[in-house]
Amino acid sequence: MCSQLWFLTDRRIREDYPQVQILRALRQRCSEQDVRFRAVLMDQIAVTIVGGHLGLQLNQKALTTFPDVVLVRVPTPSVQSDSDITVLRHLEKLGCRLVNRPQSILNCINKFWTFQELAGHGVPMPDTFSYGGHEDFSKMIDEAEPLGYPVVVKSTRGHRGKAVFLARDKHHLSDICHLIRHDVPYLFQKYVKESHGKDIRVVVVGGQVIGSMLRCSTDGRMQSNCSLGGVGVKCPLTEQGKQLAIQVSNILGMDFCGIDLLIMDDGSFVVCEANANVGFLAFDQACNLDVGGIIADYTMSLLPNRQTGKMAVLPGLSSPREKNEPDGCASAQGVAESVYTINSGSTSSESEPELGEIRDSSASTMGAPPSMLPEPGYNINNRIASELKLK
């Protein structure tokens, strides 16, 4: 019987760059490898239990067979456990292999839940406080006093650097309390001064680091997100950094994810966040990779009678220019060429038609395996100071 693969996403984000790239890559690979492919929107699905048996309806039609693998891309900050996760759990109960799994997505939709999962595993992370009630922010102003000032304040459901504040003192915290929405809790986190305005985004697929990008703020703010106007440049990662990112991915049960690492003065790292629905427009550009294609290759490897998940070779991309460059940090000129400023809400320049059944696709995707990332010894903070002038 022919294998079946679904790409499941949300109507609100279906035309964003990551979804368009993954969709094209999956369509091409499924067409070439005789795999039945279907692109599905979350609101097209109805889950059923009839006669004590689980069932599934798609566009009001009952299905008699179900996909072997489902690649999931849902807007993580707005994922609802009573709706979206219900559908994902149902698919999993039907025997579908989800990428990422429902529990893995839940581990990342709330920033404090992420730290709860990582706690007890020796993962370096900032001291963090949070609370249960929606109206308890003001109470936490005193409770979080041991964290000192300035203190980082984040919405547990924030994304893309939004709803993040650096409070100078208790009075500033009180002002923030009156300005924010209280529909979700906030967390209070110890400020990592040495990583102000910079971090490293690491993308992990199938338990392997496929690339890393240094992100830097250009306006002095604490957040370095490219969606807020920050810049990103390809950055070699030490073995310690790679192993930390892989450890976090494994603890959270992720098939693919983005891990954000804060940079300490001694060259070590502290985990800032994990992203189950990682965006990769800036990452693709800065690192000259095809993350959508890499995720598609990994997903295909999970189909029956294929590799069982672990990719033997990282299926990333590297240009001829990259292959001819020496190992180590890029020159100042190379850094300038690799830095991109990404505006919030950027999408692909080509709009994708309504998601539906697979059709022949003329879109081509690249697939040459890259060399492993170099691991030279270097001081990343000095690099930032001398080349990006941001320290």
UniProtKB/Swiss-Prot annotation:
Reactions that this protein is recorded to catalyse: N-acetyl-L-aspartate + L-glutamate + ATP = N-acetyl-L-aspartyl-L-glutamate + ADP + phosphate + H(+); N-acetyl-L-aspartate + 2 L-glutamate + 2 ATP = N-acetyl-L-aspartyl-L-glutamyl-L-glutamate + 2 ADP + 2 phosphate + 2 H(+)
Co-factor binding comment: Binds 2 magnesium or manganese ions per subunit.
Entry-linked SUPFAM superfamilies: Glutathione synthetase ATP-binding domain-like (SSF56059)
Residues holding Mn(2+) 1: D260, E273
Binding site for Mg(2+) 1: D260, E273
Compositionally skewed regions (Polar residues) per UniProt: 341-350
Binding site for Mn(2+) 2: E273, N275
Physiological role: Catalyzes the synthesis of N-acetyl-L-aspartyl-L-glutamate (NAAG) and N-acetyl-L-aspartyl-L-glutamyl-L-glutamate.
Protein family: Belongs to the RimK family.
Protein name per the record: N-acetylaspartylglutamate synthase A
